[in-house]
Structures are given as structure tokens and as C-alpha cells.
């Protein structure tokens, strides 16, 4: 029987699509190109995460018309973001290669054909604040057939503490997994508190591929970015203070900043030093970082790709908010000899120059973890009942 991958990918978020691509590619490399299905499923009832609110055929026409007017008033070049969306849809079909059947709701997964194993993860599949558009976190896999074997690779909770209100639900669901691996130490602690077992911490799927493998997959043969630049990627909504700080960073580095974001860019005053790159699809995002002189990011996956391509980086997070994604950035930097490298984004906005370097990266430890993580993934597959 085949193996199935159940993960986040029907969206325009770069990290989500790229981790799904990397894990599917790795699984297919281990088991065979035709031995792995990526379960094609909606993340919300109208498929808005992938299809958006302007051209989405699942949204009534009058709402699309109203949304188009709102977007035109609020966002910078929404037409380019819609172009990015179209390119992302095409890339997912070609590179992730999900199943022909689209499961419109978690309830439909009860009719899922039997698989030898369903692999859940990676990314923030178990974030209690996300993935609840259907009234529950679908990646807890409670809608899978009861007898279906399930494991988790590099699952992330995205928070350092689980709210008390959902601990019972999570504990019951996670105990049904035969084996779990997580992406962060904080996730390991949460799992241990819920199940009594501390799972191994493994690398994000994007780091299972080497820089050479990423070059072969998405960089080689494609046109490079136009000249030296800083690749900036913001997962939170970009503010004018962010743009102004990036302009100062550009002047400090002596090269322009090419700015990408997880969602549409608001209408802001973009100085000449900051060039919006709104229509970059996930593979263009990788190329931007691979070809950059340095990286500035508040994103976990922005940091991952800076490390993969050994680019000097400024990692920025809200260090005063325990609910922010900063814990993931801090955890990664601490594990690989970059402790203290995550700068508070408020300080960055206030003009404090970031520490930009990659020389301290413990490459030996990172490579050892890559080999170990691949071994853990093989163990998930080989020890099935």
C-alpha cells in the first residue's frame, strides 16, 4: 500500500508550500515516485487560503466585487499578488502533485482509502490558533479512519504553551499517533506534558534537502535576481516602520532590499532602497534568498533558507510576546551556535543595527541533525505495523 502525506500546502504561504514540496520529494525519494500520495484537501470551506477572495469561484460574485474594491483601496498592487496566487496554484499542481480528488472537508477524510501510513506534518499543523476553519484542528487527524496508522514528522505547535481549553482534545488525539517527531523543543515539552512521552526533535523538511538539491530543484537554469540585494521576507503584516528600518538596513549594506511578504503588501511609502517583490511564487522566493547578499526576516522559513544557502542574516522577532513566532527562531539559533542572534523587531524599527553574520553557524551539528532527521523519517516508515 501507499503512504500518504497530510500537511498544509493549499495556501500562498511560502514556507508551507516549500515544506510540503520538500517532504513529498524526500518521501518519494525513499519510497518511490508513485508510492506517496499528498492528500489534496481544503484548509477552509471556500478554499480561500489558496484561491483568495477576489477571483475565488467559491465566493459569491458580489462579495468578489466588493473584495476587489477593498483590496484596491488597501493594498499595494493587488493584481501582482493575484498573479502570485495563480503561479502558486500551478506550482503546487506540478511540484507537490496532490491527489486528483480534493477533499472539501475533514469529514470527507473518513472515506479515505487505506494507506500503510499517513504522515502528518510538518509546519504549524498543531497550532491551536490556526487550522480551525472547520471548527477543529484537522491536522490532529481525528477525521481519518479509526484504524488508519498515523505518524507525525516535524510537527509544530507554533506556540510555547498550549491553552488549557484544548489540552484534553490534543492529548486524546496525539495518543492515537503511533510515533511523533516535532520541530521544536517547546513542542517536545508540550507533547511530553500531554502524552507522557517526549518525542525526538527533528529538522524542518526544507532542511532535509541540501543547498545543492535546492539548486537542482528550483534555482539552476532560472534567471537570477537583478544585481546584489538583500532578500527581505516578512510573515507578519508589513508596517511603515518596517519599511523605514529596511531602508536604513539597505543604506548600511550598500545594496537595495527586495521585499517579499506572506500576504498582500499594504499601501505604504516605499523609498527607492526598498523594492516590493509582490508576485514572487515559492520557487522565486527560494531563488531570491539563494542569490542574495544577505537576508532580513521575521520568518522561521526565511531563517531556514538563509541557513541552507549560508547567507548572512538578520533574524527579527517580538521577543516580549510569548505568543509570537520568536521562540522558533530563538530555538533554531540556539541549537546551532547562533544564540542571541534573534533581535527584537521593536529595536530594529527604532534604528538599532542588526547583527548580520552566518559565520558562527555550527555546520557540523546541522549536518549531523540532517542525517539524524532523515533516519527518524525512515524509522517512521519502517516501523509501521
Language model segments and positions:
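Active-site anion-handling motifs in enzyme catalytic cores
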Residues: 1-385
